[in-house]
Amino acid sequence: MLFHAAEKTGHHFTIGAAGVDVFFVISGFIMWVISDRRSVTPVEFIADRARRIVPVYWLATGVMVAGALAGLFPNLVLTLEHVLASLFFVPARSPSSGEIWPVLVQGWTLNFEMLFYAVFAGSLFMPRNWRLPVVSGLFLALVIAGRVVAFDDAVMLTYTRPVILEFVAGMIIGEFWLKGRVPPLAVGSALFACSLGGFALIGVLGLPFDELTTGPLAVLLVIGVLSLEANGCVRALSLPGLLGDASYSIYLWHTFAISVVAKAGLAIGLGAPATMFAAVLSGTLIGIAAYMMLERPLLRRGRARRVTAGLAGRAAE
């Protein structure tokens, strides 16, 4: 969000985009750990992810489409093919820019997540000790194919990027976590500090800003934070907990608020630092509001339906 707020208000916070790399590592970690602690079938896994991800994303995409049709987003070019590809998480080139982006631009990360979900769900058919090697081998093969073959197709260009290995790294970290093999506090603190310093040096040294530089740093950051948590240095606080719960809604909706605030700040002559602060605050607040009024009620309704269906099924037996 800081990256988008800085971009819209004339600042530079390119390194903020590296949050995606951290997110992919965490995604692999969470899927691996949760699947080990709670038995779930491939169908149940996919259904659970779809219930969480799809409805709110479709709603946010619908708002973008409606806004474009109403003339609120003059730079957004719509085609039926691109809208459908966006809704069904198929990587496709945007008619607006030629980039491989969905209608809701930040949704490009969900295109990767859907690959992760599909492959991970498939791995649940296998014995546990096969899963990590098979997923790792598949993703490594895809990356090698991307280096060897000059793909032009948007799907293959997306799914052969080295960034997918960050998900595998998260799974590997999760396996070490489950075995209790976490770095001691001194090592974890050093890894955490090195990762933050490394992110800062990317801009200072003019290093390439891609997953080959940000990916390893994201891995170090996650390992460092896990070490801090395992050693009791991370406390559970209500505000960070709320932001974590609302993170998906913040991710989906923050750009709407940031765009409005950036334009308003420019119109009234508000200074760039104040505009950026207001943009970040508004993006956070709209995400929390969307979580409380949209995402959380939808999730609760879905859980209630599953409980009702389960009770009805047992009664029928």
Curated annotation (Swiss-Prot):
Name a GO CC annotation attached to this entry: plasma membrane
Compartment(s): Cell membrane
- Report the source organism: Rhizobium meliloti (strain 1021)
Q: Where are the transmembrane segments?
A: 14-34, 53-73, 100-120, 132-152, 185-205, 206-226, 268-288
Q: Which UniProt keyword terms apply here?
A: Cell membrane, Exopolysaccharide synthesis, Membrane, Nodulation, Plasmid, Transmembrane, Transmembrane helix
Q: Main subcellular localization, coarse class?
A: membrane
> What is the membrane topology listed in the Swiss-Prot or TrEMBL record?
Multi-pass membrane protein
Q: Name one GO biological process term.
A: polysaccharide biosynthetic process
Q: InterPro entries in the record, alphabetically?
A: Acyl_transf_3_dom (IPR002656), Acyltransferase_3 (IPR050879)
Entry function: Required for the acetyl modification of the third sugar (glucose) of the octasaccharide subunit of succinoglycan (EPS I).
Q: Which family does it belong to?
A: Belongs to the acyltransferase 3 family.
Give the molecular function GO annotations.
acyltransferase activity, transferring groups other than amino-acyl groups
What is the official name of this protein in its record? Exopolysaccharide production protein ExoZ
Q: Give the Pfam families listed for this entry.
A: Acyl_transf_3
